[in-house]
UniProtKB/Swiss-Prot annotation:
Polar residues: compositionally biased ranges: 373-382
Covalent link location (Glycyl lysine isopeptide (Lys-Gly) (interchain with G-Cter in SUMO2)): 112, 211
Subunit and partners: Interacts with SP1 and SP3 independently of DNA; the interaction with these transcriptional factors may be required for basal transcription of target genes. Interacts (via the RING-finger) with isoform RFBP of ATP11B. Progesterone-dependent isoform 1 interacts with EGR1; the interaction requires prior binding to DNA and represses c-Rel via a DNA looping mechanism. Interacts with GATA4. Interacts with PCNA; the interaction promotes polyubiquitination of PCNA through association with the UBE2B-RAD18 and UBE2V2-UBE2N ubiquitin ligase complexes. Interacts with RAD18, SHPRH, UBE2V2 and UBE2N.
Span list, region Interaction with SP1 and SP3: 922-1005
Superkingdom of source: Eukaryota
PANTHER family, sorted: HELICASE-LIKE TRANSCRIPTION FACTOR, TRANSCRIPTION TERMINATION FACTOR 2-RELATED
Pfam families xref list: Helicase_C, HIRAN, SNF2-rel_dom, zf-C3HC4_2
Triggers of expression: Isoform RUSH 1-alpha expression is increased by progesterone and decreased by estradiol. Progesterone induction is increased in the presence of prolactin. Isoform RUSH 1-beta/RFBP expression is increased by estrogen and decreased by progesterone.
Protein name (Swiss-Prot/TrEMBL): Helicase-like transcription factor
Species: Oryctolagus cuniculus
Length: 1005
C-alpha cells in the first residue's frame, strides 16, 4: 500500500522503524521501507469546506415529496422524525433510486421514481445536501409525506434550480427557523410558485473564540455537580489533588453508570430520541466513558492511571500482584549496584515471591515490577533518571545500535526466560535517530519470548471469538509518539514499588501480534501511527481483534479529522469503556467534536449526518436551540477545569504568579534606516492593491512585507532569503514563473510563524504554492482540486487551479539558503543586545535560574547561540527540525537540576508539542510576538503548570514604532473577539473585512 499524506509533520508519519516491548524489554529490528506517495492516497484534511457535510453553507429552499414502498421494508418512523436520503446507483430496477432510511439506518422506503430522477443528478454531483423530515410517519401503510431541504454552495444554486425545473419541480421558501414548523405549511412541489430564499452564511470562528466558548459551557457548573471526591486504589502511590479526586469519582461513575445516554427518554415502553424523534424497543447503550478536557498541566495522565487501577470490574480495583518487602529491598539494592557503562545481560530468574498471585507458574510474557520498570527514583519529588546510552556505529550500508547500559530499573524479570544483550543490524533509514529514541525507551527483548509469542499467533482467529465472550481485562492506551516516554515515566512514578503490572508497549516490527497474549495484559500502550499502520495492512489488526476493557486516547483531538485513516482505525476499536484525554477538544472548529462523540459511541451521533443536522450546523449558524443541545451534551460527557477554576472557593491549581512585562527596544540608526526603506517600498505596493481592490488576492505579498519588517526587528541577517513583493506576471516564462513562486513560498516558510492553510485552518504541512501565488497544505489543495474537478478554483481568489501546476519548495534550495546564512559574518542586533544584558544580569543575581528564549524564527535562535557561547552560558535547544530522540534528550538535560546543567533553552514557538513540561524554567524571554496570542500563552504554560514552585516572569521584547507594536494591537483585538458568544461571530464577508482592517493597522495605512 502507499503511505498517505497527513496534516501532522511528515517525520511523525514515517516512524515505521519501531520496537516491541512488554514492560521492560525493548526490541530492535530491521526497519521497513517507505512506499512512495501516490496522489490517490491523499487523505482529505480536517473535514474542510469541500467535504460532503460542508456543502450546506446556504439554504436553497424546501421541496415536498413522498416516500413509497413502505410495506416492503421494516424501518418505521414517527411523526416529525428526521430521515436520511441515500443514493442507490446500482439498483437493478432504477439507476436513479434513492433510499429513505431512519435514524437507525433501517430502510423505510424509497422516493417516487419521478422525484428520484430529478434528485439523483444533484446528489451524484454533490451540488446540494438534501435532508428529509417526515411530518406524519405513524400509521402509514403504503406512502408517507416527506419534507426536504436543500443546502449547498451559493455558486451551485442555479444548477440545482435548473435541474429541478427541468423535471418540473420548484423549491419553496425556507423555514423561518433552523428547526421545522411543519404545522405551518408545506414546501413547494410541482408547478408551485417560486420564492426567493434567505441566505444563511456560515460563521467561521477563530481558535481563540472556540476555546473560550468551550470554557463558557462550564461556567455555570454547580458545586454539587461532578464535585464528589474519591480516593484512588491502594496501588497508586502519588496522592491525588482535590480536582483529580473529583475527576476520578466522575470517571468511575461514568464507567459504572446505567443511565440512558443524552437525549434519550423512556416513553410507553419505547426508547425515544428527543432531537431526531426516532424511537426503538431496544435500550440504547449508555456511554461508559467521556472526555476529560482539563487544561494542560492539571494532571490528566495521573488521573487516568488512577482510574485504571481503581475501577476494574463491579466497582473493584484492578487485582495486582504484590512483592514481599524483602524482595523489594533486594531488587532496590540490585538497582543501586549498577555501574554506568557496564553492558548488562538479563539473567534467568526464579519465580518471584508474590502475595495474592493471580497466575499459575506458566511462563509470563510481561511480568513488570514497578520498581524495576520505572525510569525514575522515587526518593525525591524531582526523581533522578538514569539515561539509556545508545551507541551508534556508522557504516556505509547499515547502522549498528547497541544498548551499552540498560538501567536495572528498566529490566524487570521474566520467569524461565533467557535473554542477552545483542547487536542488531538496522538497515538505512531517514529516521534512524527517532528509531534510537524508540529503542531507548525500554530494554532488549528475549529471543525465547519471541518464539513463545509467535507459537500462539496461529490460534488468532479462535482466540478472537473467546476474547469477545470473556470479560475483558486490558486497557489500551493510544498516544502520540512524542509522549510515549512520558506514559512510561508516569506509570513508574505513580505506582507503588511493590506493585506488579502486566504492561506491554506495542510498538515496532517485532511487536507481539497474538491477540490472546495481548488480551492478558493489564495495560497495552501504543501510538496512533502503529494503530493506523496495522489497520491498513492485510489481515486482521491484532488491536482490532480484541475487545478491550477500556480504550484511552491521549491527546484525543488527534482523531478530529473524520476522513483520516487514523480516525477510522480508532473508531473501529471494540471496548466497554472509552476515554478521551485532551486539553483542546476543539482545535479549529466545532466539527472537531464529532469524531470524539463517534468514538464514545454516542447514539445517534455515531452517524455524522445527525450530529451535523442537529448540533453542528445550528450552532455555527447562531441557533439558540442548537447551542442548548450542545451545552447539554457537553456537560453530560465532559469534565473540564481550567487553571482558574475553583474548588470550594480555592483555585484548582495554586500556581505562583506569572507577570508579563513588555520591554521596548529602540533600533539602531542602521537598523531603522533599513526598516523604513523596506516599509516605504512595501507600503506603496500594498496601497496600490487597496486602491485596486485586490489586497486579498495579493495576500502572499502582504505577508511577505510583514515578514520582512518582523525580521528586521529581530536581526537584519534574517533578510537574506527575502524577495521583492512583485508577483507572477502574464509575461513570465514557465521557468521565470517557477522561480518567482518558489521564492514567494520560501518567504513564507522561512518566517517560522503560525501561518495557516486557508483550507484546514492549521499550520502549513507539505506546503505547495499555486500559480496565483497562494500557499496551502498539499493534501488540502489536492483534495480540493479533486473534489471540484473539472473546474477547480483557488479557495482564496477563485482563480482556476490545476494539480499539475502546484509547486513544492525543493529541499536542496532550503538547505542552500541555510548554508549561505551560516557563512555570513556574525553581528549583533538591538534585540540580541537587550537579551544578553538581561541574561547576564540574571546570572549575576542567581546563577541557578533557568530561562526559555522563544522565537518564531529558528535562524534567529541560531544567531543567538553565538553570544551565548561567548559569554559562557550552558544552553540547549528545542526546535521542529530535531528528531524526537534529540528532543527528549534536550528536555531531560534542561530539566536536570545538577550543577553544570543548561540554564537556557532556545525554543522555537512551534516546537512545544504535546506533553512538554519545562517547569525547570522560571524566566521566559519572548523575542518576537506571535500572530496568535494563544500560541504565546501555550508556550508560557510549558513552565507555568503543575509542579512549578517559583514565580514565572515573562519578558516580551517589542521594537518601538514598528509592526510589532501593531501586532500587539491585533492580539488585543483577537482577545476581545474571543470574549464573544456563539451566534455573534462574524460571517465570511465580515471576516474578510476584518482581515483587510488588520492589514491597514499593521502597515499604518
Amino acid at each position: 500500500m502507499s503511505w498517505m499524506f497527513k496534516r501532522d509533520p511528515v517525520w511523525k508519519y514515517l516512524q515505521t522503524v519501531q520496537y516491541g516491548v512488554h514492560g521492560n524489554f525493548s526490541r530492535l529490528s530491521y526497519p521497513t521501507f517507505f512506499p512512495r506517495f501516490e496522489f490517490q492516497d491523499i487523505i482529505p484534511p480536517d473535514d474542510f469546506l469541500t467535504s460532503d457535510e460542508e456543502l450546506d453553507s446556504v439554504l436553497f429552499g424546501t421541496l415536498r415529496g413522498h416516500v413509497v414502498g413502505l410495506r416492503y421494508y421494516t424501518g418505521v418512523v414517527n411523526n416529525n422524525e428526521m430521515v436520511a436520503l441515500q443514493r442507490e446507483p446500482n439498483n437493478p430496477y432504477d439507476k436513479n433510486a434513492i433510499k429513505v432510511n431512519n435514524v437507525n439506518g433501517n430502510q423505510v422506503g424509497y422516493l417516487k421514481k419521478e422525484l428520484a430522477a430529478a434528485l439523483a443528478y444533484i446528489m451524484d454531483n454533490k451540488l446540494a445536501q438534501i435532508e428529509g423530515v417526515v411530518p406524519y410517519g405513524a400509521n402509514n401503510a403504503f406512502t408517507m409525506p416527506l419534507q426536504m431541504t436543500f443546502w449547498g454552495k451559493e455558486e451551485n444554486r442555479k444548477a440545482v434550480l435548473d435541474q429541478l425545473k427541468k423535471h418540473g419541480f420548484k423549491l419553496g421558501p425556507a423555514p423561518k427557523t433552523l428547526g421545522f414548523s411543519l404545522e405551518s405549511g408545506w414546501g413547494s412541489g410541482r408547478a408551485g410558485p417560486s420564492y426567493s430564499m434567505p441566505v444563511h452564511a456560515a460563521i467561521q470562528m477563530t481558535t481563540e473564540q472556540l476555546k473560550t466558548e468551550f470554557d463558557k459551557l462550564f461556567e455555570d457548573l454547580k458545586e454539587d455537580d461532578k464535585t464528589q471526591e474519591m480516593e484512588p486504589a491502594e496501588a497508586v502511590e502519588t496522592p491525588l489533588l482535590p480536582h483529580q479526586k473529583q475527576a476520578l469519582a466522575w470517571m468511575v461513575s461514568r464507567e459504572n453508570s446505567r443511565e440512558l445516554p443524552p437525549f434519550w427518554e423512556l416513553r410507553n415502553d419505547l426508547y425515544y430520541n428527543t432531537i431526531t424523534n426516532f424511537s426503538e424497543k431496544d435500550q440504547p447503550e449508555n456511554v461508559h466513558g467521556g472526555i476529560l478536557a482539563d487544561d494542560m498541566g492539571l494532571g490528566k495522565t495521573l488521573t487516568a492511571i488512577a482510574v485504571i487501577l481503581t475501577n476494574f470490574h463491579d466497582g473493584k480495583p484492578l487485582p495486582v500482584e504484590r512483592m514481599k518487602k524483602n524482595q523489594v529491598k533486594k531488587e532496590c539494592n540490585s538497582s543501586e549496584s549498577d555501574k554506568p557503562g557496564r553492558k548488562d545481560t538479563i539473567k534467568k530468574t526464579d519465580g518471584l515471591s508474590k502475595e495474592g498471585s493471580r497466575y499459575s507458574e506458566e511462563p509470563s510474557i510481561s511480568d513488570v515490577k514497578k520498581n524495576k520498570y520505572s525510569m525514575s527514583e522515587l526518593s525525591s519529588s524531582q526523581p533522578k533518571r538514569k539515561k539509556i546510552a545508545v551507541q551508534y556505529i556508522e557504516s556505509s550500508d547499515s547502522e549498528e545500535i547497541e544498548i551499552s547500559e540498560l538501567p536495572q530499573k528498566m529490566k524487570g524479570k521474566l520467569k524461565n526466560v533467557q535473554s542477552e544483550t545483542k547487536r542488531v543490524k538496522v538497515g538505512p533509514s531517514k529516521i534512524k535517530e527517532d528509531t534510537a529514541f524508540a529503542c531507548a525507551l525500554t530494554s532488549s527483548a528475549s529471543t525465547t519470548t519471541k518464539k513463545i509469542l509467535k507459537k500462539g499467533a496461529s490460534a488468532q482467529r479462535v482466540q478472537r471469538k473467546l476474547m469477545f465472550e470473556e470479560r475483558p481485562r486490558t486497557t489500551l492506551i493510544i498516544c502520540p509518539l512524542s509522549v510515549l516516554s512520558n506514559w512510561i515515566d508516569q506509570f513508574g512514578q505513580h505506582i507503588k514499588s511493590d506493585v506488579h503490572l502486566n504492561f506491554y508497549v506495542y510498538y515496532g516490527p517485532d511487536r507481539i501480534r497474538d491477540p490472546a497474549l495481548l488480551s492478558k495484559q493489564d495495560i497495552v500502550l501504543t501510538t496512533y501511527n502503529i494503530l493506523t499502520h496495522d489497520y491498513g495492512t492485510k489481515g486482521d489488526s491484532p488491536l482490532h481483534s480484541i475487545r478491550w476493557l477500556r480504550v484511552i486516547l491521549d491527546e484525543g483531538h488527534a482523531i478530529r479529522n473524520p476522513n483520516a485513516q487514523q480516525t477510522k482505525a480508532v473508531l473501529d476499536l471494540e471496548a466497554e469503556r472509552r476515554w478521551v484525554l485532551t486539553g483542546t477538544p476543539i482545535q479549529n472548529s466545532l466539527k472537531d467534536l464529532w469524531s470524539l462523540l463517534s468514538f464514545l459511541k454516542l447514539k445517534p451521533f455515531v452517524d455524522r449526518e445527525w450530529w451535523h443536522r442537529t448540533i453542528q450546523r445550528p450552532v455555527t449558524m447562531g441557533d439558540e436551540g442548537g447551542l442548548r443541545r450542545l451545552q447539554s451534551l457537553i456537560k453530560n460527557i465532559t469534565l473540564r477545569r481550567t487553571k482558574t477554576s475553583k474548588i470550594k472557593g480555592k483555585p484548582v491549581l495554586e500556581l505562583p504568579e506569572r507577570p508579563v512585562f513588555i520591554q521596548h527596544i529602540t533600533l539602531s540608526d542602521e537598523e531603522r534606516k533599513i526598516y523604513q526603506s523596506v516599509k516605504s517600498e512595501g507600503k506603496a505596493t500594498i496601497g496600490r492593491y487597496f486602491n485596486e481592490g485586490t489586497v486579498l488576492a495579493h495576500y502572499a505579498d502582504v505577508l511577505g512585507l510583514l515578514l520582512r519588517l518582523r525580521q528586521i526587528c529581530c536581526h537584519t541577517h534574517l533578510l537574506t532569503n527575502t524577495v521583492s513583493s512583485s508577483g507572477p506576471s502574464g509575461n513570465d516564462t514557465p521557468e521565470e514563473l517557477r522561480k518567482k513562486l518558489i521564492k514567494k513560498m520560501k518567504l513564507i516558510l522561512s518566517s517560522g510563524s503560525d501561518e495557516e492553510c486557508a483550507i484546514c485552518l492549521d499550520s502549513l504541512t507539505v506546503p505547495v504554492i499555486t500559480h496565483c501565488a497562494h500557499v496551502f497544505c498539499k493534501p488540502c489543495i489536492c483534495q480540493c482540486i479533486q473534489n471540484e474537478q473539472p473546474h477547480a478554483k483557488c479557495p482564496l481568489c477563485r482563480n482556476d487551479i490545476h494539480g499539475d501546476n502546484l509547486l513544492e519548495c525543493p529541499p536542496e534550495e532550503l538547505a542552500c539558503d541555510s548554508e549561505k546564512k551560516s557563512n555570513m559574518e556574525w553581528t549583533s542586533s538591538s534585540k540580541i543586545n537587550a537579551l544578553m544584558h538581561a541574561l547576564i544580569d540574571l546570572r549575576t543575581k542567581n546563577p541557578n535560574i533557568k530561562s526559555l528564549v522563544v522565537s518564531q524564527f529558528t535562524t534567529f535562535l541560531s544567531l543567538i547561540e553565538t553570544p551565548l557561547k561567548a559569554s559562557g552560558f550552558v544552553f540547549t535547544r528545542l526546535d521542529g527540525s530535531m528528531a524526537q530522540k534529540k528532543r527528549v534528550e534536550s528536555i531531560q538535560c534542561f530539566q536536570n537540576t545538577e550543577a553544570g546543567s543548561p540554564t537556557i533553552m532556545l525554543l522555537s514557538l512551534k516546537a512545544g508539542g504535546v506533553g512538554l513540561n519545562l517547569c525547570a524554567a522560571s524566566r521566559v524571554f519572548l523575542m518576537d510576538p506571535a500572530w496568535n496570542p494563544a500560541a504565546e500563552d501555550q508556550r508560557f504554560d510549558r513552565c507555568h503548570r503543575l509542579g512549578q514552585k517559583q514565580e514565572v516572569i515573562i519578558t516580551k521584547f517589542i521594537v518601538k514604532d514598528s509592526v510589532e507594536e501593531n501586532m500587539l494591537k491585533i492580539q488585543n483585538t483577537k482577545r476581545e473577539l474571543a470574549a464573544g458568544a456563539f451566534g455573534t461571530k462574524k460571517n465570511a464577508n465580515e471576516m474578510k473585512q476584518a482581515k483587510i482592517n488588520e492589514i491597514r493597522t499593521l502597515i499604518d495605512l
